[in-house]
């Protein structure tokens, strides 16, 4: 009986170990990150087309050997564009398994999403209502970093080595005729090698592939020992360890057709009549191992559940421990700014001063030192660290670190050489440096930055303080949205919020926010519209403008010019006729759509970016703006009834001088 029991137990144990082995062989793809935007109804035609597309992508075996496949389903506004891209060194079977898993994962991670991009180590899958896969300049990005930093003494040499390796990889991938995939390895030292991998979707031309990869490489922060950057049309990655199949002379070796069999454990032979003893010996060896495995799994699961619960219960906006790896020592910051010398002072923000600094590795930074006497500063400080640490976009200022010691609260940002937009925009001596081409580029960059906050980042973020002073310009006059102290994070399904404490800058605030504390993505859209009018005119919204014996702010003034058929009277005289008439009128039109009083009438940032980049898109007729100052001879028509409600409180929003 005991032998029978032992054999039963041995059978169950063998089954258990076999199950573990099968599970290991069928391991899920390694998740990296995803972007999910624009929820849609499950009852819509678009959603039905999406389900058909996902099924088609994951079931057509003919394309897995190519490693990539694109499809469209539906027509007109219900059309869905879809694509998958498997890593260039992946076997067709592994590619198939990853795509099937991704299609299923899509339905759980982004139920009802109109645009989605998910990345695994093995493959990428995405879909959208527009062809984002052939667009080499997109706001849909996934960026990840290795948490380990390069030592200061090795930083410059490391950066140069990685950049050189990535560029060579990009050239090789672009010139590839098939998968547009390349991997390279170089020796950084006698004991350390660097590894790089780049890939474009096969449908891109060589020129577009190079352009896409060059842009992605620019976004990588090489002071980390590893990182990757993904957009729908290309991706790049570097590490200090091999993460791809070994290569010979730059050619990727094909993976084996099937995995080699696991080595079998040889069973010792026993003399006849010793069967019982052999069973006991096998059990004595295997049982403790199996029990140890079970205990380890149980302990790991227990701690994992505790961590998950802790993460769920902790308010995200007050938790800066996740950014702990970004923390600077106060002495380092003090030395970098020469003890916060007035010679290094760049300006003053709402809660403190901003200084220029130079870190020990030679990197120039902007140091924002919050005032010690600011009662509101600590909350905004923690908020800014948590929000900005998770953002990676070319049109958003990069947070490099922070310092929180005793009473000191300091934020360390990348140094942007050309100061802020208002420095050029509202100074008659500097305005000439902003021709219309530059201003148009700035408008587009700001729009893409805000779109990333609203739609393409992992969090939905409302900036709440968008203004010319919070737009920094780099050496090439590219805009970077800054100052996230007022920003708020929205939940996935949240569309608006209320606050009793209205913060921000009067003149840029939307009516519903200034008067009722209600804010949403459309609040940022309103601020963006005001900012566009300032960029076009070179004038501040807070100033007073006289027209037909009546006064108003810049928004009101623009509306009257538009109504009178003379919108070009708004244009900054510093660039006179050096602009395209239709282009600038279209920008004024878009700005007026943004500042409409009814939030439902204001376009989304996604629509605004499309309006700016596609001249064929028809624009709606703008309605009167919020805070509309109506002159005595203007009558409130059907579209103006609601505007009159705002004129009562207008003086509390834009400071008026007595008449």
Curated annotation (Swiss-Prot):
A molecular function GO annotation: protein serine/threonine kinase activity
Keyword terms, alphabetized: ATP-binding, Glycoprotein, Kinase, Membrane, Nucleotide-binding, Phosphoprotein, Plant defense, Receptor, Repeat, Serine/threonine-protein kinase, Signal, Transferase, Transmembrane, Transmembrane helix
Catalytic EC class: transferase
Purpose of the protein: Involved in multiple distinct defense responses. May function as a disease resistance (R) protein.
Domain Gnk2-homologous: 28-132, 138-243
Topological domains annotated Cytoplasmic: 301-659
Repeat found in the keyword field: yes
Expression induction: By salicylic acid (SA) or by a bacterial pathogen infection. May be regulated by WRKY DNA-binding proteins at the transcriptional level.
Subunit architecture: Interacts with CRKIP1 (KAPP), CRKIP2 and CRKIP3, three kinase-associated type 2C proteins.
Modified positions (Phosphothreonine) in chain numbering: 505
Record membrane topology: Single-pass membrane protein
Name of the protein: Cysteine-rich receptor-like protein kinase 5
Active site: 465 (proton acceptor)
Residues reported to bind ATP: 346-354, 368
CDD domains registered for this protein in UniProt: Gnk2-like, STKc_IRAK
Pfam families documented for this protein: PK_Tyr_Ser-Thr, Stress-antifung
GO terms of biological process kind: defense response to bacterium; programmed cell death; response to salicylic acid
Membrane-spanning segments: 280-300
InterPro entries from the UniProt entry: GNK2, GNK2_sf, Kinase-like_dom_sf, Prot_kinase_dom, Protein_kinase_ATP_BS, Ser-Thr/Tyr_kinase_cat_dom, Ser/Thr_kinase_AS
Domain Protein kinase, residue spans: 340-619
Superkingdom of this protein's organism: Eukaryota
GO CC annotations, alphabetized: membrane
Family: Belongs to the protein kinase superfamily. Ser/Thr protein kinase family. CRK subfamily.
Signal sequence residues: 1-24
């Amino acid at each position: 009986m005991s032998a029978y029991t032992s054999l039963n137990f041995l059978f169950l144990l063998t089954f258990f170990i076999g199950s573990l082995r099968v599970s290991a062989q069928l391991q899920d793809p390694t998740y990296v990150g995803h972007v999910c935007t624009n929820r849609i109804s499950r009852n819509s035609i678009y959603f039905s087309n999406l389900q058909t597309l996902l099924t088609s992508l994951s079931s057509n075996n003919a394309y897995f050997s190519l490693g990539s496949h694109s499809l469209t389903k539906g027509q007109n506004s219900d059309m869905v564009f879809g694509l998958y891209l498997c890593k260039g060194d992946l076997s067709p079977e592994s590619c198939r398994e990853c795509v099937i898993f991704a299609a299923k994962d899509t339905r759980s991670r982004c139920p009802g999403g109109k645009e989605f991009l998910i990345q695994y180590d093995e493959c990428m899958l995405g879909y959208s209502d527009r062809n984002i896969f052939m667009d080499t300049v997109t706001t849909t990005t996934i960026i990840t970093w290795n948490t380990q930093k390069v030592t200061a003494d090795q930083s410059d040499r490391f950066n140069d080595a990685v950049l050189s390796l990535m560029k060579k990889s990009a050239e090789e991938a672009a010139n590839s005729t098939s998968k547009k995939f390349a991997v390279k390895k170089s020796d950084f030292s006698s004991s350390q090698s660097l590894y790089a991998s780049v890939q474009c979707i096969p449908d891109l031309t060589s020129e577009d592939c190079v352009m896409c990869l060059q842009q992605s490489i620019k976004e990588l922060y090489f002071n980390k020992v590893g990182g990757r950057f993904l957009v729908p049309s290309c991706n790049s990655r570097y590490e200090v360890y091999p993460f791809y199949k070994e290569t010979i002379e730059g050619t990727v070796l094909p993976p084996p057709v099937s995995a080699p069999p696991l080595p079998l454990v040889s069973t010792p032979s026993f003399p006849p009549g010793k069967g019982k003893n052999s069973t006991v010996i096998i059990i004595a060896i295997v049982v403790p191992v199996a029990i140890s495995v079970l205990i380890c799994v149980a302990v790991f699961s227990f701690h994992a559940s505790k961590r998950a619960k802790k993460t769920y219960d902790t308010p995200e906006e007050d938790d800066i421990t996740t950014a702990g790896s970004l923390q600077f020592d106060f002495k380092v910051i003090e030395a970098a700014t020469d003890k916060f010398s007035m010679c290094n002072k760049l300006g003053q923000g709402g809660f403190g001063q901003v200084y220029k600094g130079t870190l020990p590795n030679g990197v120039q930074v902007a140091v924002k030192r919050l005032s010690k006497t600011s009662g509101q500063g600590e909350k905004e400080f923690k908020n800014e660290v948590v929000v900005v640490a998770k953002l990676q976009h070319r049109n958003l200022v990069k947070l490099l670190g922070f310092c929180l010691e005793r009473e000191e609260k300091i934020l360390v940002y990348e140094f942007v050489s050309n100061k802020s937009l208002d420095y050029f925009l509202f100074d008659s001596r500097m305005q000439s440096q902003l021709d219309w081409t530059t201003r148009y580029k700035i408008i587009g960059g700001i729009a893409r930055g805000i779109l990333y906050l609203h739609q393409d980042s992992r969090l939905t973020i409302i900036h709440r303080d968008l203004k010319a002073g919070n737009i920094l310009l780099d050496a090439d006059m590219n805009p970077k949205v800054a100052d996230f102290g007022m920003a708020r994070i929205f939940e996935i399904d949240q569309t608006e919020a209320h606050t009793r404490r209205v913060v921000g800058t009067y003149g840029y605030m939307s009516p519903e926010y200034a008067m009722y504390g209600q804010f949403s993505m459309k609040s940022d859209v309103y601020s963006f519209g005001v900012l566009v009018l300032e960029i076009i005119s070179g004038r501040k919204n807070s100033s007073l403008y006289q027209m037909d014996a009546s006064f108003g702010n810049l928004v009101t003034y623009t509306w009257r010019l538009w109504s009178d058929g003379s919108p070009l009277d708004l244009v900054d005289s510093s660039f006179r006729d050096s602009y395209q008439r239709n282009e600038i009128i279209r920008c004024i039109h878009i700005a007026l759509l943004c500042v409409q009083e009814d939030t439902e009438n204001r376009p989304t940032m996604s629509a605004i970016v499309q309006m700016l980049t596609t001249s064929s898109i028809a624009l709606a007729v703008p309605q009167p703006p919020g805070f509309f100052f109506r002159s005595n001879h203007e009558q409130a028509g059907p579209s103006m009834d609601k505007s009159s409600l705002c004129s009562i409180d207008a003086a509390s929003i834009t400071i008026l001088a007595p008449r």
